[in-house]
């Protein structure tokens, strides 16, 4: 019985656990671009984008509009200079009104390079007339 219990605990400990968002600190600045509900949806889009990160927890998600706009400007410049920015391309195709940069801090059971990273999103129209956040790219910004 003790051996079975030890094996069960070992399997539970090693079994990949889903992304934990139960203790996430969410920091959203005042926004002139997006409604509160849209920014709430942005946070949920990030959780969905990171759902594959097993044995990780999201410690903080931050949207700072001024910082986001500065990065959008840099990504547009990078794209215009031929450096292949996914966000810059999306902004040139759809306009900058839907562009947002989100900062995500994570802790994982085993260290991964992408624990703390930046995600670039566009709020894009869908066939049914709604708008949905679409991840354009991410990196260790």
Q: Can you describe what each PLM-predicted range is?
A:
Residues 3-4, 75-83, 122, 134-138:
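Short N-terminal secondary-structure initiator segments
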Residues 8, 93-96, 127, 137-139:
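Intrinsically disordered, low-complexity segments enriched in small/polar residues
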Residues 11-116:
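Flexible low-complexity loop/turn motifs enriched in small/helix-breaking residues
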Residues 117-141:
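Short beta-strand edge/turn micro-motifs at domain boundaries
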């Amino acid at each position: 019985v003790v051996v079975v219990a030890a094996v069960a605990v070992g399997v539970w400990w090693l079994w990949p656990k889903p992304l934990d968002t139960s203790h996430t600190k969410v920091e959203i600045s005042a926004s002139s671009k997006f409604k509160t509900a849209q920014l709430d949806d942005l946070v949920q889009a990030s959780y969905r984008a990171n759902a594959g990160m097993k044995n990780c927890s999201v410690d903080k998600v931050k949207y700072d509009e001024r910082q986001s706009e500065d990065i959008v400007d840099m990504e547009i410049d990078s794209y215009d200079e031929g450096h292949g920015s996914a966000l810059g391309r999306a902004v040139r195709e759809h306009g900058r009104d839907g562009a947002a940069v989100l900062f995500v801090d994570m802790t994982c059971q085993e260290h991964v390079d992408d624990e703390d990273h930046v995600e670039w999103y566009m709020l894009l129209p869908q066939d049914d007339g709604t708008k949905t956040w679409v991840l354009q790219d991410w990196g260790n910004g």
